[in-house]
Amino acid sequence: MIKMAMHRLSNKGVHEKIGYVYLSDTPGGLLLEAELEGLPPGDHGFHVHEYGDIEPGKNKKGKVIAGGAAGQHLDPARTGKHLGPYRNGHLGDLPYIIVEDDGTCDDAVLAPRLMLEDVEGLALIVHECGDNYSDYPLPNGGGKSRIAGGIISNDCPYCKKERNRNLMILGTVAAGVYAFKKL
């Protein structure tokens, strides 16, 4: 089982943690259990991407996009087809997740064509909109922007950066309090 942290994404970078996704192998495929908060209500595309990076990156047109360094949907067979989780298109196509009106998501999806060994170290992305599992009328199911993501690993590099930043802030505050008391 992997417990991975998910973070808010923008074209400026990787931001605060918004929850976790738990991944585990089952006889029916890879089970992904999302516990997220702070997302817009509604359906959201949910995909494994080809690289293990969620920093901003350039798309094919050269525009910097949120989570662009994750690359495209995982598609090792190079099908080039967006057919959803149950057909033979992108392997990274997952069932969409549903966010409640209060911005929380407590949803579980099953990816029958995947196992942990297929995805460990890669990026998991939540898209702004739902997914119709087609490239019509919009590419990649119409999911639009990448709004959240994480690296499929128990060892979150972004959590370490956040923890180190918080420790630096705490140390600075503590030093300031000590200096103030000395006055």
Description of each model-found segment:
Residues 1-183:
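N-terminal leader/targeting pre-sequences
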